[in-house]
From Swiss-Prot:
Protein name: Maestro heat-like repeat-containing protein family member 7
A GO cellular component entry from the record: cytoplasm
Region (Disordered): 1-144, 183-203, 246-265, 363-385
Low complexity bias: start-end ranges: 33-65
Upper taxonomic lineage: Eukaryota, Metazoa, Chordata, Craniata, Vertebrata
């Protein structure tokens, strides 16, 4: 079985498709930034000024040859005019075979880039090729092509020990278009340019070509030789081929003999090899990497062979013979993750101690003809190239393993590179490690599987923080003046590598979600207090937008991802004190507008020319005005109206708030004022023109304002941040109030200021409507229909408390003072023992080791009641409750009604002007609500019977209500009804009717708690004193004695003594004649009392000697008559 090299595959560019950008830097196709040459290419001459570092991805678009912002005309000058020996074509061949183990698999062109024909094209010579030109036209091969190109072919191959399973194409090497156009020296023998250029190689290019897959473990004949052309880049040997002999001939072929019988020893011989890699099949294996340095080697130095073996295949008698090779690179999976050091070792030294090595890097001199700039960077290039090769070899190419293993390998490598980036210092830039790691990550992005959104965000955050946090170039150069030039070069290389990584990540997942995961980590850096950090962030954002416009692989019907935040942050930067930042931000907005306009026109199936569209939009949005950047802000906001929905308006407002955060003290006063002005203009204009679109997102806007206020301390900035509240409340009062009710409780200074903003700033809302909304919320139960606790009433009470602190609001509150007072008193009763959802706001001044005071909702509600009384001028009433302990009683379940009665009694005593209004409001409240509602209303109502105005109330609402209360199932309602009747009995016209109700009142005391009995009996004494002589029926007294008797043994001493005292007084009220029934009842009540006396209760005898004496005499009289 042999692989013939006679078949050629010709690659050409499809002009009908949008090519996929490579991983090199994208020039400012739509920006004013001049493309910088990539300094990482050490073996190719630098291009002339303006030569594209990325393909023009639209027939009408190409990089600006003058470095000017925006698309450029199609007539681009030939790069060869600069003197660079740039080839006009290149031919790439792949081997062809009839064996079933060789699988030519055409891969789809993912991004419309260099697309090979779907079928291999036989070629008897190397004269057929396609010309890659800026005009994307196909031309015949010219005569002036260098001979090295006309006679040199490159094989593209991939191995797979299991051809039946699709492969993720891990680490298939390729040449980017830039390398094909610029780096013609890669085809020369003894060239030192590696086939895989880490800084400008796009791994996804090979996905569109035919891939040769060779399964060396499927040979039927053990003696059959498998011939691989030197142009097959990768050949994987599965662990079934445990005995193999590798060698290379002068013709550049690799002969492999497979033995179907596995054995523990593996002997490998490699001669004239430029690149040999032994990749372990498990974490305990070793990696062997060889690089040729012989100038006159007959084998192309760009060839590569890879052995994949499981750890079980390695044994003590395994041997590896490598000849005509200068340097070996050895690494171990197990050790590499712990130690990233790289050491070199000449091949002549002893190779037996592999475990002591983790990597050997081949250092090579630059070839003749290399440019001076490339020579200056050769040292860093060598480090980078070999680091890249090392990481490549660490990644296993085991195609016969499960996809889960492949996923873990990529994840491990990504984490390794991220850790390497994190280890780099943030205050200096003296090592290319940061840049190299990002370039390796960029190439990893072309492998499967793609990163998840979370992983991509973490990766971007890590890289962006490492680069953006660096000091300014000037600061780093001043710190180390001797390396100023090196720092300058390395700095630009690092920024370029970061941009390449961002672009590569976008190509990895060219979806709205993928773009969002890249843009979101960049956004906050645009609001940095340091100029150089803002400049880097704006530049990166604009570059990503530029790249998106050129590529534009997706269409979003619902709008651009994170449009509001991105637009808002760029708008703020238009007003940046640094004019260059402002200018670039406006250019980024123009690109963003063009993307949105392009998608809109694409949806309408319109013919589009990106170049013309961009230029039109640039004129449409106007030039940058450094003297008055706010004019640019206003213009942009006005013109973006077609693309702003509710979510975008919300994000715009929140982005404006980000610009108000406390800025570094190093910023001058003028700079701070400029940035605050930009935020204010942005907020005001958005609210003025698009506030009607924010209706459905008002809760999110209010929450965002609350969160941002914690980071804004400057008074003027806080005023600006609170503007949306008053603006939105003037049009959407209900929605704003409902949103504010969701603020964490208890209200901190930020939440309180948001409530006050409703009436402090213009345009202010209607205070009358505001108070009515709060009153409505206060009338709700703090329990939902599903039985869950609701925070709305307590939040409404808190908001009312803050509004009462504004003097201008007090007069408006008086209008609904009675309703507010009654609603608050009822809410106090509802909140007793209520556990609300966990929405307690953390206190700024609370330390970690100090627990904040426990937030008790009922106490907060009582505080609001007290505040309302004081603001309404009821200071005497408040003081009265303070003296009587009423405020404490109000928060307790068993005594809440007593505190309400005390308050009503105090208001009557001090002649509160609002009592009549309260009286008439209470009448309908007595019929509504549940038990707590009725108890609170009744407790206040009965005390108002002391007023003269009660005569105006119909009897059915006074006396009739009290009579109904005597039969109520709640004992408290019975006690309150008795109190009401007693108060009514003080009026002569009511005395007779109340006297007739005395038996019912006494009877209602049965089976009642001793404390309530004491309270009711205390009220009944008034009636007994006034009507004692008129009562001839002793049955009422006997009923009272029967009621008091069970409480003689009450555990509470106050209850016992009070009932016995009352008992003695009732006995004295008895009158002759006595009936048999009365004597029996009297005897039954006196006997337990005598037992108490006999037990020698000194306290009882001491407190009530007269009552006991009277009762004893009466008892003797009864016995004598019997």
């Amino acid at each position: 079985m042999a692989l013939s090299r006679g078949t050629s595959l010709i690659l050409h560019e499809d002009p009908e498709k949008t090519p996929s950008p490579n991983s090199c830097e994208v020039p400012g196709i739509m920006s004013n930034t001049t493309p910088r040459p990539t300094p990482d290419l050490t073996l190719a001459p630098l291009p002339a000024h303006g030569v594209a570092l990325a393909p023009a991805l639209h027939p009408a678009l190409s990089p600006d040859p003058e470095g000017v912002s925006g698309p450029v005309p199609n007539d681009i000058s030939n790069p060869n005019a600069s003197g660079a020996a740039t080839p006009s074509s290149i031919q790439i061949n792949t081997a062809d075979t009839d064996d079933q183990s060789l699988d030519h698999t055409p891969k789809p062109n993912l991004a419309g880039t260099l697309c090979p024909d779907s079928q291999p094209v036989p070629s008897l010579s190397s004269t057929q090729a396609t010309v890659l030109s800026p005009e994307n036209s196909i031309k015949p091969l010219s005569e002036d092509i260098p001979k090295s190109f006309s006679s040199k072919v490159f094989g593209l191959g991939q191995s797979n020990s299991n051809p039946s399973r699709p492969e993720p194409n891990l680490y298939i090497r390729a040449l980017s278009r830039e390398a094909l156009v610029r780096s013609h020296t890669i085809s020369r023998q003894s060239s030192q340019t590696p086939l895989l250029l880490p800084s400008n190689t796009s791994l996804d290019r090979l996905h569109s070509g035919n891939i040769s897959k060779v399964n060396l473990g499927r040979a039927q004949n053990s003696n059959e030789a498998i011939t691989l052309t030197s142009h097959t880049i990768f050949a994987s040997v599965s662990k079934e081929a445990l005995s193999a002999s590798w060698n290379t001939g002068s013709k550049g072929s690799v002969n492999v003999t497979s033995n179907s019988q596995p054995r523990s020893g593996l002997n490998v011989t490699v001669t004239h090899a430029s690149h040999v890699s032994l990749i372990p099949g498990s974490s305990e294996g070793l990696s062997l990497h060889s690089s040729a340095q012989v100038p006159n080697s007959t084998l192309s130095p760009s060839s590569c062979m890879t052995l994949i073996m499981g750890s079980e295949s390695l044994s003590m008698d395994s041997s590896f013979v490598v000849t005509d090779t200068s340097t070996l690179t050895l690494s171990s999976h197990r050790d590499y993750s712990e130690d990233n050091s790289i050491r070199t070792m000449p091949l002549e030294e002893n190779l037996g101690k592999w475990d002591s090595l983790q990597g050997v890097t081949a250092f090579r001199s630059p070839p003749e003809g290399t440019s001076e700039d490339a020579k200056a960077n050769e040292s860093e290039k060598r480090d980078h190239d070999n680091d890249t090769a090392l990481v490549e070899n660490i990644i296993s190419y085991q195609k016969n393993q499960d996809e889960v293993e492949v996923t873990g390998e990529k994840e491990t490598t990504v984490k390794m590179m991220m850790r390497k980036i994190q280890e780099e210092p943030l205050d200096s830039l003296l090592s290319p490690a940061r840049r190299q790691a990002m370039e390796i990550l960029a190439q990893l992005s072309h492998t499967k599987p793609i990163l998840s959104v979370r992983e991509r965000v973490e990766l971007v955050n890590t890289c962006v923080r490492s680069v953006f946090s660096l000091p300014s170039v000037q600061a780093m150069q001043e710190k180390d003046e001797s390396k100023a030039e090196v720092i300058q070069t390395l700095y630009h290389q690092t920024l370029d590598s970061l941009q390449k990584l961002l672009n590569a990540l976008f190509i990895e997942d060219p979806t709205p979600a993928g773009l969002k995961s890249i843009l979101e980590p960049l956004g906050p850096w645009m609001n940095s207090g340091k100029v150089h950090e803002r400049a880097r962030a704006v530049n990166s954002n604009v570059s990503v937008l530029n790249y998106t416009l050129v590529t534009l692989p997706f269409f979003v019907s619902s709008g651009f991802p994170t449009l509001g935040l991105l637009l808002g942050r760029l708008l703020l930067r238009i007003g940046d004190p640094d004019e260059e930042i402002g200018r670039e931000a406006l250019d980024g907005i123009t690109i963003l507008y063009t993307i949105l306009d392009l998608q809109k026109r694409t949806k309408n199936k319109e013919e589009i020319n990106k170049k013309e569209l961009y230029e039109t939009n640039k004129r449409f949005l106007g030039p940058y005005n450094p003297a008055s950047p706010c004019q640019n802000i206003l213009r942009v906001i006005a013109e973006f109206g077609d693309f702003l929905g509710p979510q975008q308006v919300r994000d715009l407002l929140l982005a404006a708030l980000e610009g108000l955060k406390d800025i570094s003290e190093t910023q001058g006063k003028d700079s701070i004022e400029m940035m605050q002005l930009a935020s204010e203009v942005m907020l005001s204009s958005v609210l003025e023109w698009y506030r009607h679109r924010a209706l459905e997102v008002i809760p999110e806007i209010m929450q965002g304002i609350y969160m941002q206020l914690s980071h804004i301390q400057e008074p003027r900035a806080r005023e600006v941040a609170l503007l949306p509240i008053s603006f939105l409340a003037s049009s959407f009062m209900t929605e704003v109030v409902v949103a504010l009710l969701m603020c964490p409780l208890p209200l901190d200074s930020n939440g309180a200021e948001m409530w006050r903003q409703l009436i402090l700033r213009k345009p202010s809302c209607d205070v009358r409507d505001l108070l009515d909304l709060l009153l409505t919320s206060l009338k709700e139960k703090p329990v939902t229909k599903k039985g869950r606790a609701s925070i709305v009433p307590l939040a409404a009470a808190s908001g009312l408390c803050e509004l009462l602190s504004v003097n201008s609001c007090v007069g408006r509150v008086r209008r609904i003072y009675p309703q507010l007072l009654l609603a608050l008193l009822i809410q106090v009763h509802y909140h007793i023992g209520l556990n609300l959802p966990s929405r307690v706001a953390p206190r700024k001044d609370s330390k970690d080791d100090i627990q904040p005071p426990l937030f008790v909702p009922v106490r907060w509600m009582v505080k609001v009641v007290k505040t309302l009384l004081l603001k309404m001028g009821c200071s005497y009433e408040s003081a009265f409750l303070e003296e009587q302990g009423g405020w404490e009683l109000m928060g307790q379940a068993e005594s809440h009604y007593r505190a309400v009665s005390l308050l009503a009694r105090a208001m009557v005593h001090y002649s509160c002007q609002e009592l009549c209004r309260i009286l008439y409001l209470l009448i309908p409240l007595l019929e509504r609500g549940d038990e707590r509602h009725k108890i609170t209303a009744t407790a206040f109502f009965v005390e108002l019977f002391r007023m003269e105005q009660v005569r105006r109330i119909p009897e059915e609402y006074s006396l009739g209500r009290m009579v109904e209360g005597l039969s109520h199932r709640d004992p408290i309602m019975k006690v309150l009804s008795i109190r009401g009747l007693v108060i009514l009995a003080r009026r002569s016209e009511k005395m007779t009717k109340v006297q007739g109700l005395l038996p019912s009142m006494v009877k209602s005391l049965k089976n009642m708690d001793g404390v309530l009995v004491m309270e009711a009996v205390h009220d009944l004494k008034t009636i007994f004193k006034g009507q004692a002589k008129k009562l001839t029926d002793n049955s009422v007294y006997i009923e009272m004695l029967q009621t008091l008797l069970p409480h003689f043994i009450d555990a509470r001493e106050t209850v016992r003594t009070s009932c016995i005292n009352t008992y003695g007084k009732v006995v004295k009220k008895l009158r002759m004649p006595r009936t048999q029934a009365m004597e029996e009842q009297l005897t039954s009540t006196l006997m337990p009392l005598l037992f108490i006396i006999q037990e020698g209760n000194a306290k009882v005898s001491q407190h009530f000697p007269l009552e006991f004496h009277t009762a004893g005499i009466f008892f003797l009289l009864v016995c004598r008559n019997v």
